[in-house]
Amino acid sequence: MSRFVQDLSKAMSQDGASQFQEVILQELELSVKKELEKILTTATSHEYEHTKKDLDGFRKLYHRFLQEKGPSVDWGKIQRPPEDSIQPYEKIKARGLPDNISSVLNKLVVVKLNGGLGTSMGCKGPKSLIGVRNENTFLDLTVQQIEHLNKSYNTDVPLVLMNSFNTDEDTKKILQKYNHCRVKIYTFNQSRYPRINKESLLPVAKDVSSSGESTEAWYPPGHGDIYASFYNSGLLDTFLEEGKEYIFVSNIDNLGATVDLYILNHLMNPPNGKRCEFVMEVTNKTRADVKGGTLTQYEGKLRLVEIAQVPKAHVDEFKSVSKFKIFNTNNLWISLAAVKRLQEQNAIDMEIIVNPKTLDGGLNVIQLETAVGAAIKSFENSLGINVPRSRFLPVKTTSDLLLVMSNLYSLNAGSLTMSEKREFPTVPLVKLGSSFTKVQDYLRRFESIPDMLELDHLTVSGDVTFGKNVSLKGTVIIIANHGDRIDIPPGAVLENKIVSGNLRILDH
């Protein structure tokens, strides 16, 4: 928290503090307003309209940020959700499918969150353009999935990409290659907000530019921005006019987030006749998911609670797998008409996530964000569906990439499914060390992807390379100490083995 805010909180504990605080906050808001007006004067006529919308949106978020004090949830009010508010997927699936699947599919729009860069995996440009399977990128697989649906059922399900200013240009260049696919592709941009100095709480940006020295002055404000940006883009009204009724929103790097016909049918033909405006797919927590947001009952409504909102004294309780058994997959099904209604009433309420960052020059900043799932409490008749783990297959690291590139999964029409040859439906735990962090380095260290059908756990640390046709089974731990190197020879079978020390294989 900034020194400014700390000074404020001290002042609050004194007499007349609230009045003093109010004056300070008003002064600060006025200063920010002036700074934003200065920034807007640097916009060209072409940039002016969308920059003004962005800065107006930022001002609203900033105003709320200044008003908030302490954790945004009262721990005493958090309850487990009622039984009927989170339905098991098996129950949804048991209802079967309608005779005319195309009639429900034609009411759907698929939206993929495509604002992220591949920097965490050492790649420049949009993450969605990283090759994940047989040289297919995340975007290729998404297009293949939807094209398969449209061809199979003679439907017209469009794909919409929510880009950020970081990914828009590169994504649009690549979209030409899908011109002959049977998928209409649309894009819109999420907002661009200025980062603020952690001490002064004023914007770092001096002009609208986000290149050169100003590259780090701006950020995309989280996927909660989808509601306003989708509405402002005009696409929301376009789809409503075309008779579309629901959007299926998911992260483009979640390879398990395919269109599920059973969930869609449940939305379009609810058993009690009352339609859900918002469905969140949740899945059971494992020890690896303790930080994931969870669905709770709060003041009579379903509410997503993230770890950042939890008071420090209750963090361990929040992480407990026994008390909070599920977490949010960020696969969401949302009524288009409801988004329009709530957006026009300014009634979409999402908690602010304060994300601290340090810029390359060492300046400490904060960026204010919101999360798309946090809006669940603003919608009527919301529902959680507890889906199989297979619908949550995110690729955040090269460890995840190794899993999806391996023979653990088979690829069919853009969809990955667990191989029938694997005896257990669980996914192995894979931890690759820092030598594998960048995709380029990772690919160089595997002559071919090992056979992992019988693998339970793999840990690799240090300078390690794998030859062709290696097979890994059970628990395998490979550790090359600093200065050492281990080459796993071609055709090696490692089952329940620890490999350490130094092993070099050189061409004769």
Curated annotation (Swiss-Prot):
Q: Which residues carry this modification: Phosphoserine?
A: 13, 434, 448, 461
Q: Where is this region: Oligomerization?
A: 457-508
Residues annotated for UTP binding in this entry: 113-116, 127, 190, 222, 253, 396
A GO BP term, please? UDP-alpha-D-glucose metabolic process
Chain sites annotated for binding Mg(2+): 127, 253
Kindly name one Pfam family recorded for this protein: UDPGP
Q: Where in the cell is it found?
A: Cytoplasm
Query: Chief subcellular site?
Result: cytoplasm
Report if keyword Nucleus is assigned: no
Active site at which residues? 396
Please verify whether the record's keywords include Cell membrane.
no
Please list the residues that carry the modification N6-acetyllysine: 438
Residues reported to bind substrate: 115-116, 223, 251-253
Annotated TM spans:
none
Q: Which residues carry this modification: Phosphothreonine?
A: 426
Q: What is its EC number?
A: 2.7.7.9
Which keywords, in A-to-Z order, does the entry hold?
A: Acetylation, Cytoplasm, Magnesium, Metal-binding, Nucleotidyltransferase, Phosphoprotein, Transferase
GO (cellular component) term, any one: cytoplasm
Q: Which GO terms describe its molecular function?
A: identical protein binding; metal ion binding; UTP:glucose-1-phosphate uridylyltransferase activity
Annotated region (Critical for end-to-end subunit interaction) at 502-503
Q: Which family does it belong to?
A: Belongs to the UDPGP type 1 family.
The UniProt function text for this chain reads: UTP--glucose-1-phosphate uridylyltransferase catalyzing the conversion of glucose-1-phosphate into UDP-glucose, a crucial precursor for the production of glycogen.
Q: How does it associate, per the subunit comment?
A: Homooctamer.
The protein's name is UTP--glucose-1-phosphate uridylyltransferase
This protein's encoding gene: UGP2
